[in-house]
Amino acid sequence: MTANLAGDVTMRYVDLPPSEPADAVPVLLLHGFGTNFGMNWSAAGWPQALGGAGLRVLGPDLRGHGGSDKPLDEAAYLPERFTADLLGLLDELAVDRVDLVGYSMGSRLAWELALTAPDRVRRAALGGFGPVNAFADADLSAPGAGDTPFDQVFRTVSGLAGNDAEALAACARGQAARPFAADPAPVGVPLLFVSGARDTLATGAEDLAARCGGTHVEIPGRDHANAVSSRVFKQAVVDFLVG
């Protein structure tokens, strides 16, 4: 399915009903940089885990990714443009309130959405996310050309089928133009942070959780690339949303 949002962006998304109807708000899944709903969430079994817990799943491909439009202007990728997209999608679907589950860049956007529109967010689970600047030391005029952790990620994702390297570069510059700030934190939205014990891109997640009154779960033996498929991650989120 697609939604025509404000401006010139068309967003592709899926809307998956739960296995058994339940009285719960939908869950909006927000994927990481250079992936899409299918790669980040479906392939890791998240629709089944959440649907089996009685939760409706909303899964957009964020702008610049997957089957959604891919503008080439970095201003199109400022965090506030993403949050406007997500609020527009909720309005299109007549969904008043959601739970958020993000991973990596998707967690940054979940934080921003909870900060911008706390009345639309019940709870937020943030995976693979910490206060560290993901773009530190990277030359974003030529992403992928260096040896920073971000350059390594960019080289990997820019070569994936369906990705547009120019759009991803613009996305990186747009995100970097608004560095993450832990203060202020979302108010009135319970937060769960989940990170792999070997995740060098989400360092500081435990400290961030403590600073904003959230809860942190560490996944033994997992890094940034494989934490999202962990049963520990899925169970922690289901318990947080349903328990």
Regions found by a protein language model. Give the residues of each.
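Conserved acidic catalytic loop of the alpha/beta-hydrolase fold
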Residues: 80-98
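Active-site nucleophile elbow and catalytic-triad environment of alpha/beta-hydrolase enzymes
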Residues: 166-183, 198-200
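Short beta-strand/loop motif that positions the catalytic acidic residue
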Residues: 187, 193-195
